């Protein structure tokens, strides 16, 4: 797919200050280092400024403060990275689907599919499901009984929604994602695991995005709930009864244990783990590989573990770590000895 748009049109769309030829054709996006004629680029971080002088880009998205000394065509904006994100959709090569149902799709008689929806090859839509207008369901997707997909949703091939999964508007779900699988609920009866029926569902708000091979389990009693605007990366696990607040984002391989509650506008970096039945307040940032073992009640940044070191230094630190209990006991003895001596000296001075 080839897209051409005038630089002036991009300026108008962004509300940017245009410096250069408004009729210049823009055919794509690229980094400063790799951009060629016809492509627009952006300068978002100071470390990439060194590429600005020699870039072959047709135009560059710049902050006004970064435009001094650059003689090429530019669009001046407050946030070049945000501007890049906004115009990237003009050049998205993702194929556009057409309304209609592929002849190999299997749809229950009582399922409701809007005529403006697109249902791909070998998709299965079960009894009582409802598919709204302008929804795209890719090939080999499975939509379980009574599940609902709101207007403008997009499901890549091989997405699975079990029964009673309710999805808001404009939700994007990537391949391999599974929503509504049974939660991990068992009780031990004299050494034998007995299963809890997982009778809740899954509810997603509007504008949610879910990455490849991410799993969101259904609730044991009430629904597992994902708020509006939540962004989940690839290979994330959300256990039963978890609640995630609006506009929270999680990077790959995060694991959230059952019944945890995460607030609004939080960010969880890659590999973060949460134990179950804890609460995370709004506005929390958790750094990569952190293990969260108790509730967080104050906004801010939180970390656990040790940062990377050269191997030899790390081994020394690990050896010292094993001695911490012994060192603490020795320190307590020293503190008591110092206190005894100090008290004796004070008594001598008083006498």
From Swiss-Prot:
InterPro entries: Hexapep, Hexapep_transf_CS, LpxD, Trimer_LpxA-like_sf, UDP_GlcNAc_AcTrfase_non-rep. Its EC number is 2.3.1.191. Pathway: Bacterial outer membrane biogenesis; LPS lipid A biosynthesis. One of its GO terms (molecular function) is N-acyltransferase activity. GO terms for cellular component: membrane. SUPFAM superfamilies: Trimeric LpxA-like enzymes. Disulfide bonds: none annotated. It is an enzyme of class 2 (transferase). The active site is at residue 240. It catalyses: a UDP-3-O-[(3R)-3-hydroxyacyl]-alpha-D-glucosamine + a (3R)-hydroxyacyl-[ACP] = a UDP-2-N,3-O-bis[(3R)-3-hydroxyacyl]-alpha-D-glucosamine + holo-[ACP] + H(+). GO terms for biological process: lipid A biosynthetic process. Keywords: Acyltransferase, Lipid A biosynthesis, Lipid biosynthesis, Lipid metabolism, Repeat, Transferase. Catalyzes the N-acylation of UDP-3-O-acylglucosamine using 3-hydroxyacyl-ACP as the acyl donor. Is involved in the biosynthesis of lipid A, a phosphorylated glycolipid that anchors the lipopolysaccharide to the outer membrane of the cell. NCBIfam families: lipid_A_lpxD, PRK00892.1. Homotrimer. Belongs to the transferase hexapeptide repeat family. LpxD subfamily. This is UDP-3-O-acylglucosamine N-acyltransferase. It comes from Pseudomonas syringae pv. tomato (strain ATCC BAA-871 / DC3000).
